[in-house]
């Protein structure tokens, strides 16, 4: 990433909070101090650490990201982020671009088809080459020209997707929009779980909905999310509960929020909440 672009971002980004930019689907996070592990749901997106370093915990796996790799999240994934080293002089800057599946499909329709490879383990850590980084650099610089964003942003984003699809890992992105691929089916399953948080999961029914055997569904679900379907649902429930508690503040009714996200037992909810976030839900109100 061009240092001039980094300096420009440092002048406009707020610290220690997420900023949604004028480019649709493009977000930034700038941290000027270390932070404990923060749990959140990463929407389907491409993420790049433009400056500094951060650790991402996905299930039991920990990956360290700098500006040499991007993070590819094909589905909504519960993550924890840990920034060990950040300061006012050397902030950590993270870019996130939501995946535009319609745009990816359009590009695939216009480019020569390639022989598909086996689905394999998806993986979230991809090497980041100069051509992709240069395209992101131009997308960021476009923020200085707001009148050009409507026309040029989509062209640059198309180039980014084209280069990602042409890269060694391109088939992993392609699978996300190809009907019948394992990735596409698991993406449908995660969407269903997210939109039915307060309902119990029947794995057999969910596997059937995706046209997969139960064993195959379990295998591919865990390859992509690093969690079992039940673990995935629990993480989403707890993160949604945390969001609701923050929204309602002092007026939050913990037992009602627990029921809203699918917990029948408030005590079980409190135990699992504290296990994930390190504090009880009631202490969030203080």
Regions found by a protein language model. Name each.
Residues 1-22, 35-36, 118-120, 142:
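A short, N-terminal "cap"/entry segment at the start of jelly-roll beta-barrel domains
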Residues 17-115:
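N-terminal regulatory/effector-sensing and dimerization cores
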Residues 37, 119-127, 177, 204, ...:
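A ubiquitous short alpha-helical element
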Residues 55, 200, 251-252:
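Residue at a beta-strand N-cap/secondary-structure junction
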Residues 104-159, 163, 189-191:
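Amphipathic alpha-helical segments enriched in hydrophobic/aromatic residues interleaved with Lys/Arg
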Residues 159, 163-170, 176-178, 194-196, ...:
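Basic/polar phosphate-binding segments, predominantly the helix-turn-helix DNA-binding elements
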Residues 182-190, 234-238, 242:
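Short, leucine-enriched amphipathic alpha-helices that occur as contiguous helical runs
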Residues 193-196, 245-248:
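Short helix-to-turn junction characteristic of helix-turn-helix DNA-binding domains
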